[in-house]
UniProtKB/Swiss-Prot annotation:
GO BP, one annotated term: bacterial-type flagellum organization
Chief place of localization: cytoplasm
Protein name stated in the entry: Flagellar protein FliT
Presence of keyword Protein biosynthesis: no
Positions of the UniProt region annotated as Required for homodimerization: 1-50
Length: 120
């Protein structure tokens, strides 16, 4: 029974961490999300070392199934939010590259040639 409590506690910790990560992703707090992800991954690794086959209780399996479903739902939403962020960053890099090309092209001319109304 103690083993079952420990396993349930491990899954609850993962669920709590995934909920915190989802909040951070929703808020766009990417640095804190990355920091928390290390703790999350360690918790997942620790839980993976506990064998689920040792849970013979159907009630415990149902509880774990619910937690796993919620964890996976959070993972899907976090990935969606991260993809949106990646797309936004990609757009910004594209705009920056275009701006740099424009600056490089027009930077070749003397400053006075760019002023309107001046004759050369």
């Amino acid at each position: 029974m103690e083993r079952h409590q420990h396993l349930l506690s491990e899954y609850q910790q993962i669920l709590t961490l995934s909920e915190q990560m989802l909040v951070l992703a929703t808020e766009g707090n990417w640095d804190a999300l990355v920091d928390l992800e290390m703790t999350y991954l360690k918790a997942v690794e620790s839980t993976a070392n506990i064998t689920i086959s040792s849970c013979s209780s159907l009630m415990l399996q149902d509880l774990l199934r619910e937690k796993l479903r919620a964890i996976l739902d959070n993972e899907i939403e976090i990935k969606r939010l991260l993809q949106l962020r990646l797309d936004r960053l990609s757009d910004l890099v594209g705009q920056s590259t275009k701006q740099q090309a424009v600056n490089n092209t027009y930077g070749q001319f003397p400053d006075h040639a760019l002023l309107l109304g001046e004759t050369q």
